[in-house]
Amino acid sequence: MSSSFELSVQDLNDLLSDGSGCYSLPSQPCNEVVPRVYVGNASVAQDITQLQKLGITHVLNAAEGRSFMHVNTSASFYEDSGITYLGIKANDTQEFNLSAYFERATDFIDQALAHKNGRVLVHCREGYSRSPTLVIAYLMMRQKMDVKSALSTVRQNREIGPNDGFLAQLCQLNDRLAKEGKVKL
């Protein structure tokens, strides 16, 4: 490691697993991971009544698409409910460059929270890899958290397991923000 702030994917995986190296799957369809920011799965994202009960004003679909591993919703799906929508056509593979969407997702979450009663659901198919990665990036970029703090904050409130490619992208974001003096180490 060339600098004290650089972390490895293994460092982050250690935070995600229990002492035996096991990972837990989400026990709830949706969890509030930080105030007014929820991470959830496809079932809650497609349940307008449940979203309204939660007071969700914005939905960020990190798995937009028609294939099995995606969630086929769009702005028109939410149109009659008054929910603002953003879709990202992300694949849950180690090779997918989700970091290309960190800024756009962060801006959308900011937009939701700028409203007095704004609440945002960030979801993917399972609410386990893509969507928590985007929320972790948001916490790093806007709350000035380092990657371990951001990941731990989300993990305390929801079982998550971003794939190793996404964890590597979060490590790269951490390095960049640290070099720019934009995270608290």
Curated annotation (Swiss-Prot):
Keywords: Cell projection, Cilium, Cytoplasm, Cytoskeleton, Flagellum, Hydrolase, Nucleus, Protein phosphatase. GO terms for cellular component: axonemal microtubule doublet inner sheath; nucleus; sperm flagellum. It holds the Pfam family DSPc. It catalyses: O-phospho-L-tyrosyl-[protein] + H2O = L-tyrosyl-[protein] + phosphate; O-phospho-L-seryl-[protein] + H2O = L-seryl-[protein] + phosphate; O-phospho-L-threonyl-[protein] + H2O = L-threonyl-[protein] + phosphate. It is found in: Nucleus; Cytoplasm, Cytoskeleton, Flagellum axoneme. It is an enzyme of class 3 (hydrolase). CDD domains: DUSP3 (cd14579). SMART domains: DSPc (SM00195). Its EC number is 3.1.3.16, 3.1.3.48. The active site is at 124 (phosphocysteine intermediate). GO terms for biological process: cellular response to epidermal growth factor stimulus; flagellated sperm motility; negative regulation of epidermal growth factor receptor signaling pathway; regulation of focal adhesion assembly. Gene3D superfamilies: Protein tyrosine phosphatase superfamily. Residues 28-179 form the Tyrosine-protein phosphatase domain. Its main location: nucleus. GO terms for molecular function: phosphoprotein phosphatase activity; protein kinase binding; protein serine/threonine phosphatase activity; protein tyrosine phosphatase activity; protein tyrosine/serine/threonine phosphatase activity; receptor signaling protein tyrosine kinase inhibitor activity. Microtubule inner protein component of sperm flagellar doublet microtubules. Interacts with VRK3; this interaction activates DUSP3 phosphatase activity. Shows activity both for tyrosine-protein phosphate and serine-protein phosphate, but displays a strong preference toward phosphotyrosines. Specifically dephosphorylates and inactivates ERK1 and ERK2. Belongs to the protein-tyrosine phosphatase family. Non-receptor class dual specificity subfamily. This is Dual specificity protein phosphatase 3. It comes from Mus musculus. The lineage of its organism: Eukaryota, Metazoa, Chordata, Craniata, Vertebrata.
